[in-house]
Regions:
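Extracytoplasmic
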Residues: 64-67, 83-88, 97-105, 117, ...
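Stable alpha-helical elements in mature extracytoplasmic
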Residues: 118, 130-138, 153-160, 194, ...
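Sec-exported extracytoplasmic/periplasmic mature domains
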Residues: 95, 110, 114, 127, ...
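Entry/capping segment at the start of metal-dependent catalytic domains
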Residues: 6-97, 257, 289
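Second-shell loop/turn segments in exported
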Residues: 76-80, 120-128, 143-148, 202-209, ...
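Flexible, polar/acidic helix-loop-strand segments at domain edges
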Residues: 160-237
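C-terminal solvent-exposed extensions
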Residues: 45-48, 52-59, 65-66, 118, ...
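Amphipathic, coiled-coil-like alpha-helical scaffolding segments used for oligomerization/assembly
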Residues: 123-180
Length: 308
């Protein structure tokens, strides 16, 4: 007669705990998978084109071809696509030398608005024709392809920073902004503080140029923090924040490929800026970028994109 041995109580408890934990992991993984797909669908808004005319073909993401992004920050309390793009940043990403170049374009830059045939401030393009007109205008201004875009409602951006658990920046001088005090030196900022930090310009002798520097700091900090994200428990809140404030033409498969093939470039970010004198023309104040400075930046970015 076979004798059935009783399983010791501690082993039964351990088995139950392991089983519950395993099922929880599977359940959470399924939740994340569904959430990622849902968020990717929610934020996906393609451009009215297959690829940039200045490139002539789609970027080979799997082949690790250098690519460019337009980051448009819309300082608005309304919908993501309302208002003007007060933040215009171009990112070129080269996975071969594992580097990113981040270029700020002043919002008051005087240039042709493609699609209207007028010479105005570059941030007017967003108000007239959304991200499509902004992409076309920036491409024409810098003479480089803009392969993809990411549009962010800056009011909602603070939710992304909070979901990441905050970001680190290095402040050049002490100032107050939005009811917050920012001391000189290394700072750790939550979402509300990061937004106030990036908006300040009146206490900076450089005005919008200083503001642009702080915006680039925050963007770089988010890129680095996102790349180093180790806790899977943050993923749900990050997806919620992204869904509320971000729009992009990237598909989910492209996002996965970029995460896999381009992420190492995030550890080497060079911050650049186009600067120029402020001039009053027809009663309006513009930033006028010289042809020499613009052409030099174009050459630098085209080389980084391996186009020349």
């Amino acid at each position: 007669m076979k004798v059935r041995q009783k399983m010791k109580k501690p082993l039964i408890i351990a088995a139950i705990v392991f089983g519950v934990g395993f099922l929880s992991i599977i359940g959470y993984g399924l939740y994340l998978y569904m959430s990622v797909n849902s968020t990717a669908s929610e934020i996906h808004e393609p451009l009215d084109r297959e690829f940039s005319e200045k490139r002539g073909a789609q970027v080979d993401v799997e082949g690790k071809q250098p690519m460019s992004f337009l980051l448009a920050g819309v300082d608005s309390t309304g919908e993501t696509h309302a208002g003007r793009s007060d933040t215009i940043i171009v990112l070129t990403v080269n996975p071969n030398d594992k580097s990113i170049k981040m270029v700020s374009i002043p919002r008051d830059t005087r240039t042709e608005i493609v699609g209207r045939g007028t010479i105005e401030k570059i941030n007017h393009a967003y108000a007239y024709g959304g991200v499509q007109m902004t992409v076309d205008t920036v491409e024409n201004f810098l003479n480089i392809p803009i392969d993809h875009y990411v549009s962010i409602n800056m009011e909602g951006f603070k939710g992304i920073v909070d979901a990441l658990g905050g970001v680190n920046v290095n402040n050049e001088f002490a100032f107050n902004s939005g009811g917050h005090e920012f001391g000189e030196g290394p700072l750790f900022l939550n979402g509300e503080e990061a937004l106030a930090y990036s908006r300040m310009r009146k206490q900076d002798a450089r005005g919008d140029f200083g503001r642009n520097d702080r915006q680039r700091q925050i963007v770089e900090a988010v890129i680095k923090e996102g790349a180093q994200l180790s806790s899977i428990t943050k993923a749900g809140s990050i997806l919620d924040a992204v869904g509320e404030s971000v729009r992009t033409d990237l598909t989910l498969s492209e996002m996965w490929a970029i995460q896999s093939n381009y992420k190492e470039a995030g550890g080497n970010v060079e911050q650049l800026a186009l600067v120029g004198p402020s001039q009053r023309i027809d009663g309006l104040s513009y930033v006028v970028i010289s042809d020499e400075d613009r052409n030099n930046m174009t050459q630098l970015l085209r080389e980084h994109l391996e186009l020349d």
